Design a protein with these regions (language model features):
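Phosphate/oxyanion-binding loops and surfaces in catalytic or ligand/nucleic-acid-binding neighborhoods
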Residues: 17, 104, 124
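Structured catalytic/translocation cores of nucleotide/phosphate-coupled proteins
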Residues: 76-77, 95-101, 117-121, 125-126
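Asp-box/WD-like beta-propeller blade repeats and closely related beta-sheet repeat scaffolds
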Residues: 110-148
């Protein structure tokens, strides 16, 4: 079996066994009895599926990514389980999916959600040097992955 077949089988199983409420790639929360929320890990996976769609043209990747993000994003651009006042860069990461999805499927609510996340960044606490704090609960801390998460 070639690499492409292995990847296809793996991704197919991952997608077929995942929902926004219970993603197969992020089961730690579920095992702990917690509800899945808008989060960093899901943002990484959905971004990867969008990139797979762009590489392969396989509509199922885009459809899954769109359905997944659509579950969280409300018509007015608010996002379920996302509180901008937490000032948590981890929650900004999933917002990267909105750029491509808006370009690819054109849902106005995705554009509105981008604005919601942008408003957080406008007021995100910063160090005296102007760098974003990683989270409000970690005053003056800068984390390396924050560079990845807070840049589109």
């Amino acid at each position: 079996m070639g690499c492409n077949q292995i990847l296809d089988r793996y991704i197919k199983q991952l997608v077929e066994t995942s929902t926004p409420q219970a993603p197969a790639w992020n089961i730690e929360k579920l095992r702990a009895g917690k509800e899945n929320t808008w989060n960093y890990i899901d943002g990484c996976m959905i971004k990867a599926l969008i990139e797979l769609y762009e590489i392969t043209g396989e509509q199922r990747y885009l459809t899954f990514a769109d359905d997944y993000i659509d579950f969280f994003v409300q018509e007015d651009g608010t996002i379920k389980h996302y509180d901008p006042q937490e000032y948590n860069l981890d929650n900004v990461n999933a917002g990267k999916t909105l750029y491509k999805l808006y370009d690819l499927v054109g849902k106005p609510k995705y554009r509105a959600a981008m604005d919601t996340i942008y408003r957080q960044l406008e007021t995100q606490p910063r160090t005296k040097e102007g760098v974003f704090w990683h989270k409000a609960v970690y005053p003056n801390q800068i984390w390396l992955d924050g560079m990845y998460m807070a840049q589109p």
